[in-house]
Swiss-Prot record:
Coiled coil: none annotated. Belongs to the class-II aminoacyl-tRNA synthetase family. Type-1 seryl-tRNA synthetase subfamily. InterPro entries: aa-tRNA-synt_IIb, aa-tRNA-synth_II, aa-tRNA-synth_II/BPL/LPL, Ser-tRNA-ligase_type_1, Ser-tRNA-synth_1_N, SerRS_1_N_sf, SerRS_core, tRNA-bd_arm. It comes from the Bacteria. Its EC number is 6.1.1.11. L-serine binds at residues 244-246, 298, 400. Catalyzes the attachment of serine to tRNA(Ser). Is also able to aminoacylate tRNA(Sec) with serine, to form the misacylated tRNA L-seryl-tRNA(Sec), which will be further converted into selenocysteinyl-tRNA(Sec). Gene3D superfamilies: Bira Bifunctional Protein, Domain 2, Serine-tRNA synthetase, tRNA binding domain. The lineage of its organism: Bacteria, Pseudomonadati, Pseudomonadota, Alphaproteobacteria, Hyphomicrobiales. GO terms for cellular component: cytoplasm. Keywords: Aminoacyl-tRNA synthetase, ATP-binding, Cytoplasm, Ligase, Nucleotide-binding, Protein biosynthesis. Homodimer. The tRNA molecule binds across the dimer. It catalyses: tRNA(Ser) + L-serine + ATP = L-seryl-tRNA(Ser) + AMP + diphosphate + H(+); tRNA(Sec) + L-serine + ATP = L-seryl-tRNA(Sec) + AMP + diphosphate + H(+). This is Serine--tRNA ligase. The gene is serS.
């Protein structure tokens, strides 16, 4: 959420930042609403002040036995009682209109973010490792997985498209990957493990930016009785399945003031995630690349404004370390202004090399690490008390550390062997009971 005072003070800078995002200038429209809002609030406050003053004057007039003046003042107060609800309603309506408009505007990019329209304008930052050479043509994970316990047919019977059932060694390997990531972040990177709810309220979804703009991308759960309730009640009482643990973890500080000494607050969770993928029709229809349900390790940091940029670099390094320990080839790119997420000021994507994808392999996203400034904090009313005693908005950051399903794909395709089995990376073998190969009989 944007600060209207900042827009009021720097309308040209605000519009310039929106233009970098590929949006039209909005400051004039917002400031016009703000002017109406401020005028309505002023009128309401003046009416309230006059009513209070007139009430005091009535007592003074009666004390002075000036019945004529007392009667006139009582008539004035009666009129104010009639008009005040209308003025208060107008002020509330203008306030809600401004909040509604502001809530639909994405975060503004930092100055160092490269300008661009889409993923083609993203900038490569660095590369780790190199592509492996194989004595055979590498296969895609879904071709390898059929014999190893990857079952899309059964999943379709249970839930429809974009779901998978994993069995035997593959189920164990996916669990091992998630546990390895969680252990790395909690024992070496200083994150606190959290096991959050998977169902959250509307205001929680709003806080991190999923609502109102991305309502159609969410899965919603409702109690049976609400299915026959009026739409307004259904919408108010529904719960959203988290599209990422970022939603729950970040909102742990909503509507609170934390002590500066508690920052940075670093949280991590391994959870299922649920996405409707409303805009992904026809994309990645094969395999596990794009699923309605997937597992992910999420990293969230709550910081002061002065430390958020450094924390962003630290978070990226933590996510990278996962892939380095797995010895996977990857690259880091800085997203351009036209490709960033709604709540982000700046985003790094980590793309892992998958040798079985496309024609000869491809880089695919496995992690996004974003700094959001105070954008989410304003939506959540999340603040910290600085050393001077004044409450200020925190800065929030989030990143995948990493997507477990896509890490499984990368391990399968990178460590595949000519006989169709998968060599288990050294770092995962302790989580696999010492198993070194996932084969059809594993």
């Amino acid at each position: 959420m944007h600060d209207i005072k900042s827009i009021r003070d720097n309308p040209q800078d605000f519009d310039a930042a929106l233009t970098r995002r590929g949006l039209s200038p909005l400051s004039s429209q917002l400031l016009a609403i703000d002017e109406r809002r401020r005028a309505a609030i002023l009128a309401s406050e003046q009416a309230q002040a006059r009513r209070n003053a007139a009430s005091r004057e009535i007592g003074e007039a009666k004390k002075a036995k000036d019945e004529g003046r007392a009667s006139a003042l009582m008539e004035e107060v009666a009129k104010l009682k009639t008009t005040m609800p209308e003025l208060e309603a107008a002020a509330k309506q203008a306030d809600e209109e401004l909040a509604r408009e502001l809530s639909a505007i994405p975060n503004l990019p930092l100055d160092e973010v490269p300008d661009g329209k889409d993923e083609h304008d993203n900038v490569e930052r660095h590369v780790f490792g190199a592509r492996r050479n194989y004595a055979f043509a590498p296969k895609a994970h879904d071709d390898i997985g059929t014999a190893l316990g990857m079952d899309f047919e059964s999943a379709a019977k249970l839930s429809g498209a974009r779901f998978v059932v994993l069995k035997k060694g593959l189920a164990r390997l996916e669990r091992a990957i998630g546990q390895f990531m969680l252990d790395l972040h909690t024992t070496e990177h200083g994150y606190t493990e959290v096991n959050p709810p998977l169902l959250v309220r509307n205001d929680v979804m709003f806080g991190t930016g999923q609502l109102p703009k991305f309502e159609d991308d969410q899965f919603w759960a409702v109690r049976g009785e609400l299915l026959i309730a009026p739409d307004e009640r259904l919408k108010a009482e529904r719960l959203g399945l988290i599209p990422t643990a970022e939603v729950a973890l970040t909102n742990l500080v909503r509507e609170s003031i934390v002590d500066e000494k508690e920052l940075p607050m670093r949280l991590t969770a391994l959870t299922p995630c649920f996405r409707a993928e409303a805009g992904a029709a026809g994309r990645d229809t094969r395999g596990m690349i794009r699923q309605h349900q997937f597992t992910k390790v999420e990293l969230v940091s709550i910081t002061t404004p002065e430390t958020s940029k450094d924390e962003h670099e630290r978070m990226l390094a933590c996510a990278e370390e996962v892939l380095r320990r797995l010895d996977l080839h990857y690259r880091v790119i800085t997203l351009c202004t036209g490709d960033m997420g709604f709540s982000s000021q700046k985003t790094y994507d980590i793309e892992v090399w998958m040798p079985g994808q496309g024609d000869g392999g491809a880089f695919r996203e496995i992690s996004s690490c974003s700094v959001c400034g105070d954008f989410q904090a304003r939506r959540m009313d999340a603040r910290y008390r600085a050393s001077d005693g004044k409450p200020r908005f925190v800065h929030t950051l989030n990143g995948s550390g990493t997507a477990v399903g896509r890490a499984l794909i990368a391990v399968m395709e990178t460590y595949q062997q000519a006989d169709g089995s998968i060599a288990v990376p050294d770092v995962l073998q302790p989580y696999m009971g010492g198993l070194k190969v996932v084969a059809a009989d594993s």
